[in-house]
Design a protein with these regions (language model features):
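Alpha-helical transmembrane segments and their short interhelical loops
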Residues: 65, 69-140, 201-221
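Terminal transmembrane helical anchor/hairpin motif
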Residues: 155-200
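Transmembrane-helix motif of ABC transporter permease domains
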Residues: 20-37, 113-114, 202-206, 210-212
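Hydrophobic alpha-helical transmembrane segments of multi-pass membrane transport proteins
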Residues: 1-6, 22-94, 142, 148
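Transmembrane helix-loop junction
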Residues: 7-12, 48, 57, 92, ...
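Short helix-capping/hinge motifs at transmembrane helix termini and TM-loop junctions
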Residues: 6-15, 94-99, 103, 130-132, ...
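Transmembrane helix segments
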Residues: 8-10, 127-174
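Alpha-helical transmembrane segments of multi-pass membrane transporters/translocases
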Residues: 3-8, 181-230
Length: 230
């Protein structure tokens, strides 16, 4: 729905000055947004499993205490592969044509996969921290919506108020979108202020963000799960 909405409703009013028009810049933003929603999906799914008692059944089995949460993140990440394929096909259907070659496109999708995997660990922590599945889903969307819409995913950040522009420049969604645009063969005209570190090094910043997220939330989530099982 977002692909069709932005492509055919809003796309005609946004000039990019690049071959292929708005859809070429739109698709990386839409795909990153979709992957970012992994956080909410993982959190609400885990909370629902806790509510139904499925987690208690797994705890009674002779398996590692961390196996459940690791399996949950890997399972949701595998689902992301299907989502990425569907999004790519939808993009191709509405005119998206990456021009960088198959190798760079595949690297871009690997980055997207890893971004979703990192965010799924945030979702695990949120799902274990909030008991109510409905509240968990709301918390997940409260986190992901500002990150996706206060970014360069759909429009230039240069027109934002300076405070919001600064946030958007360092937003991990913005760096992921900018990095994917580069890997897909596009100049990121919706990027941050020229010369800023995120705009000059979006792929490096994305890798740093993913590493920091996993470094923080993998041990936190496993510890949270072990404490809750006690």
């Amino acid at each position: 729905m977002f692909v069709l909405l932005f492509r055919f409703v809003f796309g005609g009013s946004i000039s990019t000055g690049q071959p292929g028009g708005y859809v070429q810049l739109l698709m990386p933003g839409i795909v990153v947004q979709t992957v970012a929603f992994t956080l909410a999906g993982t959190a609400s799914g885990l909370a629902e499993d806790l509510k139904k008692g499925l987690i208690d059944r797994f705890r009674s089995l002779p398996i590692s205490q961390s196996a459940l949460v690791v399996g949950r993140t890997l399972g949701d990440s595998m689902l992301n592969i299907v989502v990425l394929v569907v999004m790519a096909l939808a993009g191709l259907a509405v005119g998206w044509r990456p021009s960088s070659g198959i190798v760079k496109v595949l690297i871009g999708f690997v980055f997207l996969f890893m971004f979703g995997y990192a965010l799924s660990w945030v979702g695990i922590f949120v799902g274990l921290s909030v008991a109510d599945a409905r509240v968990v889903q709301n918390v997940g969307f409260i986190v992901t919506f500002p990150l996706t819409f206060l970014s360069n995913a759909f429009a230039p950040t240069t027109g934002m108020p300076r405070v919001l522009q600064y946030f958007a420049e360092w937003n991990p969604v913005s760096t992921m979108v900018a990095g994917c645009r580069e890997l897909f063969g596009l100049k990121n005209i919706f990027g941050a202020t020229a010369g800023s570190f995120p705009s000059e090094n979006p792929l490096l910043m994305s890798a740093i963000y993913m590493g920091v997220i996993m470094l923080i939330f993998i041990p936190l989530s496993i510890r949270k799960y072990k404490n809750s099982s006690n």
